[in-house]
Amino acid sequence: MYEALLVVFLIVAIGLVGLIMLQQGKGADMGASFGAGASATLFGSSGSGNFMTRMTALLATLFFIISLVLGNINSNKTNKGSEWENLSAPAKTEQTQPAAPAKPTSDIPN
């Protein structure tokens, strides 16, 4: 479920960025004189503004709701972790007693 929500979250984020980039700014009236007239658009002269604004608000709401749900799911996950995920802790090593020094077989020192 977490992965599916993450995919939906990414799609909503990309759609939100796309919708924001497609909207005309407040000072976009100058573009009409250079051939970017509103009469040739899909929604007419004023129809796209309302549609784009509502879709942006809807996607922004979905973005915030899904981000809160993903954060809640992520904070409630239990750490099952494998031994490869926690490499900062040193491995337990077996410590043995050092071997006793060998007793000389002769009385002549080396």
UniProtKB/Swiss-Prot annotation:
Keyword annotations from UniProtKB, A to Z: Cell inner membrane, Cell membrane, Membrane, Protein transport, Translocation, Transmembrane, Transmembrane helix, Transport
Region Disordered: start-end pairs: 81-110
Signal peptide stretch: none
Outcome (variant: T41P): Affects activity
GO molecular function: protein transmembrane transporter activity; protein-transporting ATPase activity
Coiled coil: none
Membrane-spanning ranges: 14-25, 51-66
Disulfide cross-links: none
Family: Belongs to the SecG family.
Self-association and partners: Component of the Sec protein translocase complex. Heterotrimer consisting of SecY, SecE and SecG subunits. The heterotrimers can form oligomers, although 1 heterotrimer is thought to be able to translocate proteins. The SecDF-YidC-YajC translocase forms a supercomplex with SecYEG, called the holo-translocon (HTL). The stoichiometry of the super complex may be SecYEG:YidC:SecDF 4:3:1, YajC is in the reconstituted complex (with SecDF) but as no antibody is available it could not be quantified.
Entry protein name: Protein-export membrane protein SecG
Organism: Escherichia coli (strain K12)
